[in-house]
Amino acid sequence: MPGLDGAYYWIQVRSLLENSSLAFSDLPLVIYVQAGIARLLNDIPSAVRISDAILPALSAFPIYLIARRYPIRLLPAVGIAFVLLNPVQLFFFTGDFIKNEAAIPLVFLLSWILLSWDERGARSRYAMAGTTILAISFSHFGTLLLTLMILSFWLLVRIRQKQIKIRPLAIGIVILSGLLVVLMLALVVPSRFTRLTTFISNPGDIFILPAWRAIFYGYANPVIACTIILCQIGSILLGVIAWKIRSTFSISEISVVWSSLIVAFVLSSPIIGIDWFNRLAALAFVPLAVSGILIFAKSLTVSQRSLIGALAVITLLASASLSLRGPTPPVLSESRYSDFKEFAKTVDLPENSIVVASHGMEFLSSWLLATDVASDAYYETSCLSSYSAIFLLIDKHVGVASDKPSSAGASDKPATSGESDKPADSNKKPVCKNQIPPEGAKVFVGNEFVLVQVR
């Protein structure tokens, strides 16, 4: 499993199958799907890998439904290729952001529902949209944010086109829906609720260390840098063409086109802080793909379609060139992972223990040692007083680090298992102050790793 967070899903599925609960508090829908596959196969790692391969490909179905509305023979195939071969899908989400990519087909499905909004009765369209949004709400927080942005701008365009009248009842329904989403996060995933309240109370944090600086100074993820350039240029180019041919769109089409373009442009803005940008910009290709399909289908001239086609081709070429970099590296090489597995067999931890390890290694540690874990990045601010013993996993070659950092950026996973309803938050004052002593008892020593007891 590539990336830093691949083993995270193994732990979650195992905990769900064995304990009927998650090891880390999280939105559960995708993990429930993985657990169902694991029960059928009796193989958790294979189940997670299968979900990582198959769930994103489900986007092909709603894309086909969107594109087949227009009499252009190859449009469905080109639209599907643009999405499934997008470098974000292939190289950024794989392994680390499985929940993101698994929820993306639902966003495409919602776009199709909005596109055909006026073709259905009120009961049918509200039921379909509500069910889809509910499924997204239980899949991934970032994808839910994308969905709410699309819906908000879609609603504004519909109001401007006088297709929706503002009524007290409608306003009440919107407010109630928002409160229900917030309540769901507070009850199901307290850590996500904490992040939401932190964002609301400190909205300026989203602009700290803007992405353009990362690109300018050369430390930006190549996939993300590519996403910024393509999404910003693509949004402007498609917006100009859409404005020129605006009279050819139906109300349903123009509502989806403008809302999708605005969201794609906002999410890929280089002024967003790099930590947020790694999560938000990666989703921008979804609304960009939807708007691109609709604008291409309605374009009036060969030159307009050529420009849109060129954008799609450049995206696919970027995908091909990035593939030469190889897959996202795993936390450990095969040989070092084999050594770590042998090392884990020699470890016998006492009850009520926790292992502190570098990001990525904490998930592999939990998987192989069957214990609670914490990331070393949050060690000093995590309250671990309830544990009888604390161990620190050290790599003999690089201290607490792993082989090679993932290109995915910072993790959005909870910092500590076992007490996942009380996640550590680096923006808050520490509840407990933990100090790593200069020397500890080396209780387990392997060829590559050492386990030190610090308390």
Predicted regions mapped to residue ranges:
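Hydrophobic/aromatic-rich transmembrane helices and adjacent perimembrane loops
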Residues: 100, 145, 273-301
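Transmembrane catalytic cores of multi-pass membrane glycosyltransferases
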Residues: 5, 25-27, 98-99, 103, ...
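Signature aromatic-anchored transmembrane alpha helix within multi-pass, membrane-resident enzymes
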Residues: 172-176, 296-324
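Membrane-embedded helix bundles of polyisoprenyl
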Residues: 10, 30, 34-39, 51-70, ...
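Membrane-interface helix-loop-helix junctions at transmembrane boundaries of multi-pass membrane enzymes
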Residues: 121, 161-171, 236-263, 268, ...
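Extracytoplasmic catalytic/substrate-binding loops of multi-pass membrane glycan-assembly enzymes
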Residues: 1-12, 22-36, 331-339
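Extracytoplasmic
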Residues: 13-17, 310-386, 435
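Aromatic/acidic, Gly/Pro-rich catalytic loop(s) in extracytoplasmic/lumenal soluble domains
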Residues: 389-455
